[in-house]
Amino acid sequence: MFFCTRFMSLIVFLTLVVAGCAQVPKEAGFNDVKDLVEQRVDYNIHWNQQTEADLEVEKAIKELLKEELTPEVSVQIALLNNPNLQAIYEELGITQADVVEAGLLENPVIFGQVRFPDKSSEDNNYEFGITQNFLNILMQPSRKKLSTIRFEQVKLHVANEVIQMVAEVRKAYFTVLGAKQIRDLRNEIALAAGNSFELAQRLHSAGNISDLELVTENAHFEQSRLELARSETALLDAREQLTRLMGLWGEQTDWRLPEQLPDLPSDEFPLEQLESMAVENRLDLAAERKAVEALALALGITIDWRWVGQIEVGVSTERETDRTWVTGPSLAIELPIFNQRQADIARLEAQLRRSQKRLTAQAIEIRSEVRSLRNRLIMQRNMVDHYRRTVLPLREQIVDLTLKNYNYMLTGAFDLLMAKQQEFEAYQKYLEAIRDYWIIRADMQRSLGGRLPGHMHSRQTIQTETAAESKKN
């Protein structure tokens, strides 16, 4: 009886100790995510956890918004402030809790019974006991290892979401800046069309042009007004998209942009060995590898323990009706007669094969995507160069020659205005080509895992730590 009492006390004590020591770290692997991100892009990230550092981040964002936005500043604001990204960071806390839970023992079960004798001369029968799931204790190391692998998978997934956000913000930035320039250009086209229509009205009043020519100029003018309205709507939509990505609202939405799209870089980044670089650096591919690793481990654990069912050990004590106590250990073992976990094994085998095939498919898709983006980037640069060196100079030459003919009275004012409008139209196509180049380049950066080969970002030095945190570090 003394041994059994000590055994019962030991179970309770160990359970309380383990439960008392188990705590969920607040950091939840975020530093690992920061390391993964900083290896690929030169931006700061911050997890809003209601600390003093959050105030420093708010101040930093206010300072950044005082100046015209650049692609780098827009990305930095989004990484610090985007609420969807903050929600994704919470996945770290959820999975960290799963890791902690995997290291916990199941709670012991205490039971008691009272039996009433059918003879009034005898005392009641009492029985008390405590049991513990012993299989849960034996499998604890395997559970912790499996949950750790899944935690690593989630960290890779979260870091990949940051890389995706960088690309989305850069694409949104160049979209809105291109829309701004196109809107300004469409405004000039509308003004030119308006001047042409006013001239047509005067000439028509003087009887120098026909009704058809007047109506034609009117139609051109109204069409230019529609195109201007369409460009203004596109600008507003693009601006709101960037505002959403940066997580701004209220007075913060009154941010400013530069006047024009940046020129193309003078030299393109190296275009060799891009596929292998992408396969090596892509975090979503690394996360899928972790998924395969986790399923393989889960399958191995299930196979190893398929013949071991539920095992419960404990101790119980009973007072008989004659007031004598009977105490001893208890053992309950599940016999795997009907269910040897065949279904679990088959399910995990299928899930593992599915994950392996997904991994192969994803690697193929990444290689294909990189090749496609490389081709598009080359073609887009060639298109921009063709507009700059050939199309635009030709349009300028047409305007100059038409102006000379107009001065010599060899052509009419409408021809000159039409030539100028066509020059504007060509310039709009040129702006769209530059915009699309930068969007494709942002996609290429994402496709390669975050960093372009041979390309260094300008680091955004934004302090997001409190002085106290800096001292700790």
Give a label for each model feature.
Residues 2-77, 232-277, 445-473:
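Terminal intrinsically disordered/low-complexity segments used for targeting and assembly
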Residues 22, 140-142, 149, 156-277, ...:
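Periplasmic alpha-helical coiled-coil/stalk elements that build and connect Gram-negative outer-membrane
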Residues 22-45, 76-136, 239-248, 272-343, ...:
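A small-residue-enriched
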Residues 64, 74-81, 146, 153, ...:
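Amphipathic alpha-helical coiled-coil scaffold segments and their short linker/junction regions
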Residues 194, 223-250, 358, 366, ...:
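Short segments within alpha-helical structural elements
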Residues 390:
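Phosphate-centric recognition/catalysis
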